[in-house]
């Protein structure tokens, strides 16, 4: 009976892996100071539990932020965040990667606060060679202020995938063969910040920050970085092709992951530059490859 139970359990695990796709590797809990340091308004960052948890605080005087100590070419970058609760209109919590030059590459998560009872909006964007204008917006299918959720980026030579709790919400494929630049030779640092953006963040700036609700707090956990660390001037990753994120199963989404992406597209997407015919009468070439049109 014991051997039969073990066999059934193993079979279930194999079938579950096939059914739900291959998720990125889970991050390891390490303290904030291992990989990050504050960059401004140091007194607005609070450290808890030996640095395993960090709170960013925004008031009417300033927000705050932090960045990674290292720069990275490819990897899996995640953060567990609990967003500002209650009336968060006008606030933006950002988690992103960016290189440090004028023709920079950038991969963005921006969480746009809202009035109490209204959904948070998650805006993503990708900059290549200094050019962005690739905004996509979704409503999250949960309240991100109630608990910690994982937000992550898988970046390799083949694709950039945005995940929310291991659900792919966006893909940006390497489309250099059709003339679209792709981030591949500019190391990026990891950044996060909480700041006031009530000139645009909520309903295009119509909803202003209610400072009577301050201070606003965004909470963070999970400061492990799983990336190819490189100097800011490096042009390639020395371990290219050898890390888990380079392997075949991470070079494209599988059928089930595309199904989940389609679910997000159908039920939660509220803006997609790929389908905006006012801004782009002819869809950008990457959109068809990314299955966004």
UniProtKB/Swiss-Prot annotation:
Q: Which InterPro entries match?
A: Beta-glucanase/XTH, ConA-like_dom_sf, GH16, GH16_AS, XET_C, XTH
Q: What class of enzyme is it?
A: transferase
Example of a GO MF term = xyloglucan:xyloglucosyl transferase activity
Q: Which residues bind xyloglucan?
A: 110, 123-125, 133-135, 199-200, 204, 279
Which GO biological process entries does UniProt record here?
cell wall biogenesis; cell wall organization; xyloglucan metabolic process
Q: Which SUPFAM superfamilies match?
A: Concanavalin A-like lectins/glucanases
Residue ranges constituting the GH16 domain according to the UniProt record? 23-220
Keyword check for Manganese? no
Q: What is its main location?
A: secreted
Q: Where expressed (tissue)?
A: Root specific.
Q: GO CC annotation: what is one?
A: apoplast
Q: Where is the active site?
A: 106 (nucleophile), 110 (proton donor)
UniProt lists the family membership as follows: Belongs to the glycosyl hydrolase 16 family. XTH group 1 subfamily.
Q: What does this protein do?
A: Catalyzes xyloglucan endohydrolysis (XEH) and/or endotransglycosylation (XET). Cleaves and religates xyloglucan polymers, an essential constituent of the primary cell wall, and thereby participates in cell wall construction of growing tissues.
> What is the name of the protein in this document?
Probable xyloglucan endotransglucosylase/hydrolase protein 5
Q: What is the lineage of its organism?
A: Eukaryota, Viridiplantae, Streptophyta, Embryophyta, Tracheophyta
